[in-house]
């Protein structure tokens, strides 16, 4: 599924790491008592690093320093996981990355630097929950290559894919600055006002048409009179009015989903590798970080309107395909439920959009977070 949307979601890594430290992986084993757990360190030398890719997603990675291979590459969303020291560890060098789903990753510090673990929890927490939000500024071309660079960039700005996409999160102010920089600061064609961001879109640019505005609009691909540029701004306005995005991974991590998977294990089993206990396999699968990442990829594609053509190929009804094209995840769920014969359930869902069912509290089960370590 990820390859299906690879053209619009870049995964190229940015230069440098936000946080990094030498650490190996650890695992939990049964201890000497029912409530005891033993942390066993793996001998391989490793490196934990956090990076932000060009699509602004945060990656928590573990690399084998002996082979150079990145073994773990987890996409972490804000407040999706917590990094903390393992309580009860004698030397205080064992840390856990615990997800809200209950899964966890354990690491032991291998760095010999005395202050490596000083404020380590805060540094990692800030990197995961408060990632940088700025994008690299567009650099201006100089000399005789400037016109060629601007024409190349202008061609990409008015391509059909850019007109229909949300431009990777660029707002109107950033787009105006980008176009100005591509023009080399030529304010006659696209003047930029100093009005702070947050004003109406009409106040972002003070466009005083010149006497030859019509000629400029037809000859300059970066003129505001160009229909392609106008279409981009129209799409930006519509994208900024959309509702707050819904995390599909959070919705699917609900205990109700795991229960449904267990109850329909026989129907879902043909889609899984051979297993002696399909119900248990399904229950574990919907709680894994890999499942959450796949759900987030699907949710992103659905809420940005990229899933519409794919849904249409499955013979979905017009209302369901329309919701997918509009990026309306709630409408898509309601229409899909109705199309599958669950009209009453769809009505109930629409009336309870903001209600979230909390999982039942755990009873008489030890929590690994509060474990005693041998």
UniProtKB/Swiss-Prot annotation:
Kindly list the GO molecular function terms attached to this UniProt entry.
endopeptidase activator activity; proteasome binding; ubiquitin-specific protease binding
Q: Please provide, in alphabetical order, the Gene Ontology terms of the cellular component aspect for this entry.
A: cytoplasm; nucleus; proteasome complex; proteasome regulatory particle, lid subcomplex
Q: Where does this protein have compositionally biased stretches of type Basic and acidic residues?
A: 354-368
Asked if the keyword Cytoplasm belongs to this entry, the reply reads yes
UniProt GO BP: proteasome assembly
Ranges for the Pru domain? 13-131
Q: Polar residues: which segments have biased composition? A: 141-163, 209-223
Main localization, broad class: cytoplasm
Q: Where in the cell is it found?
A: Cytoplasm; Nucleus
Q: Does the keyword Metal-binding apply?
A: no
Q: How does it assemble?
A: Component of the 19S proteasome regulatory particle complex. The 26S proteasome consists of a 20S core particle (CP) and two 19S regulatory subunits (RP). Interacts with deubiquitinase ubh-4.
- Function, in words: May function as a proteasomal ubiquitin receptor. May promote the deubiquitinating activity associated with the 26S proteasome.
Family membership noted in the UniProt record? Belongs to the ADRM1 family.
Domain comment, as recorded: The Pru (pleckstrin-like receptor for ubiquitin) domain mediates interactions with rpn-2 and ubiquitin. Preferential binding to the proximal subunit of K48-linked diubiquitin allows ubh-4 access to the distal subunit.
Protein name (Swiss-Prot/TrEMBL): Proteasomal ubiquitin receptor ADRM1 homolog
